[in-house]
């Protein structure tokens, strides 16, 4: 029998003794997520990110994060079937400033609307806003029974479906093309576009449950900090005064470490 130490056992023992358990959360920081000024509740919650270490900067890890929030939480409302996507575009101090990134209906709402004995009409269109955002809007609507109808089914003819789809596309294009992103979001919150489509299509075939069911962000213009600050109600006292219709101006929340954008001309 060879006399000597068992190298494998001693080596393994040393390795195990050296290893230290480090809590990963000790290297992370919490940041507040702020919604744009279009919504009633600005503070969405908190997000976690690893602290700045060497070339890895914390704010770079936060930019581009997408948060899906129910409209009920944003507006302090009970109607909770709309979900808004918000994307972090800039970090000011401990605040993540977000912008609109998309909208969707919840699955249970979509499933509750689809029923037998009616026609489902869908349309989609790609439209550019006045400030250069390219959006794809999807619309859905359902035929309904007339007041004096005896027949069980309420199916629309193919020609009527085509007319309604054309009307949907026209109204969506008109409403988005003539407005900037902020005004479009203000129309999506109460879904005034869906109500306009419902009214316009009454003469072709009566509809109900007409909604802009989805909005996708296809292209964005070049990022400008000044425009993002305006969305968050921080574009200066002049713009705030115009919005409120008051000469004194409105009090706005400033993010920690906020610096006003440099103006090209005075």
From Swiss-Prot:
It is found in: Cytoplasm; Nucleus; Nucleus, Nucleolus. Keywords: Cytoplasm, Nucleus, Ribonucleoprotein, Ribosomal protein. One of its GO terms (molecular function) is structural constituent of ribosome. Residues 244-257 have a biased composition (Basic and acidic residues). The keyword Ribosomal protein applies. InterPro entries: Ribosomal_eS1, Ribosomal_eS1_CS, Ribosomal_eS1_euk. It comes from the Eukaryota. The keyword Cytoplasm applies. Residues 236-266 are annotated as: Disordered. One of its GO terms (biological process) is ribosomal small subunit biogenesis. One of its GO terms (cellular component) is nucleolus. PANTHER family: 40S RIBOSOMAL PROTEIN S3A (PTHR11830). Component of the small ribosomal subunit. The ribosome is a large ribonucleoprotein complex responsible for the synthesis of proteins in the cell. Part of the small subunit (SSU) processome, first precursor of the small eukaryotic ribosomal subunit. During the assembly of the SSU processome in the nucleolus, many ribosome biogenesis factors, an RNA chaperone and ribosomal proteins associate with the nascent pre-rRNA and work in concert to generate RNA folding, modifications, rearrangements and cleavage as well as targeted degradation of pre-ribosomal RNA by the RNA exosome. Belongs to the eukaryotic ribosomal protein eS1 family. Component of the small ribosomal subunit. Mature ribosomes consist of a small (40S) and a large (60S) subunit. The 40S subunit contains about 33 different proteins and 1 molecule of RNA (18S). The 60S subunit contains about 49 different proteins and 3 molecules of RNA (28S, 5.8S and 5S). Part of the small subunit (SSU) processome, composed of more than 70 proteins and the RNA chaperone small nucleolar RNA (snoRNA) U3. This is Small ribosomal subunit protein eS1. It comes from Tetraodon nigroviridis.
